[in-house]
Amino acid sequence: MISIFSKLKQSLSKTSNKISEGIDKIFYKKKLDAGTLEELEELLISSDMSVLVVTNIIEEFKKVKFDKEIDSDTVKEALAKLIEQQLSKSAIPFTLSENKLNVILVCGVNGAGKTTTIGKLASMYSAQGKKVAVAACDTFRAAAVNQLSTWADRANALLITGEESADPASVAYRGMEESIKQNIDILFIDTAGRLHNKKNLMDELSKIVKVIKKLDENAPTHSVLVIDAITGQNTYNQVEHFNDATNLTGLIVTKLDGSAKAGVIVGVVQKFNLPLYFIGIGEKIEDLKIFNQHDFARNLVGL
């Protein structure tokens, strides 16, 4: 059976191989000087980390006391610690309240793995003995409702749907009403995912938030954005737009197993000061893992 650490290492291989091999090449029989530091900086930027994050890492890297003879493994160890520091803002866990309804608003663009992620989370919490409900608020896409229905059956979760093309906010409201009535522990609200630069979608999300607050002024408990790791630099735009509409509390990153742009996670966490709750490293339910910044940082540099 593959361990979590090994599965993460395997998932990050497209990014980590590039960084690891780059470091090996830069520091092969070379000293740490202005030239090698510049090469290292370019390598990290090419992995889709932001310029600001890389600049911070390089400045801290210069302060590390190395022996005269420096090798690539020593560099990787130092880098892993510095990347972990940059990810310190991601360390806030995904917490739920006991004895009350937790409302989780889940948003993201089409194709990011939003509905699948909800299904995995629903299955995970159902297996822990929680009563789970799912509100299908992507009412303009029949396929999304069907997909969510399959996941809800698998997770033994209550499914709340509306008529095709119904107002998504009305479905969210009814989802909360039913969840309160049936003493549900966790309600996941699946939302539409049309392109993030479409004003109508952002208005729709804002309306959902406004409507559910009528039943609970503290709702949603969490507003989570699901990001496809393959997206790369466009991730920054997505986070900014969805954050404006829903006041995000955290992130979930999917498809790390298919991405060569995993470095973008470091920049996004640092820029927006948002925790990264879960990462998707495969298609199975158990492949949605709680994010561990220590393991991620070490695997990212090939350790």
UniProtKB/Swiss-Prot annotation:
Involved in targeting and insertion of nascent membrane proteins into the cytoplasmic membrane. Acts as a receptor for the complex formed by the signal recognition particle (SRP) and the ribosome-nascent chain (RNC). Interaction with SRP-RNC leads to the transfer of the RNC complex to the Sec translocase for insertion into the membrane, the hydrolysis of GTP by both Ffh and FtsY, and the dissociation of the SRP-FtsY complex into the individual components. Part of the signal recognition particle protein translocation system, which is composed of SRP and FtsY. SRP is a ribonucleoprotein composed of Ffh and a 4.5S RNA molecule. InterPro entries: AAA+_ATPase, P-loop_NTPase, Signal_recog_particl_SRP54_hlx, SR_rcpt_FtsY, SRP/SRP_N, SRP54_GTPase_dom, SRP54_N_sf. This is Signal recognition particle receptor FtsY. GO terms for molecular function: ATP hydrolysis activity; GTP binding; GTPase activity; signal recognition particle binding. It is found in: Cell inner membrane; Cytoplasm. It comes from the Bacteria. It comes from Rickettsia conorii (strain ATCC VR-613 / Malish 7). GO terms for biological process: SRP-dependent cotranslational protein targeting to membrane.
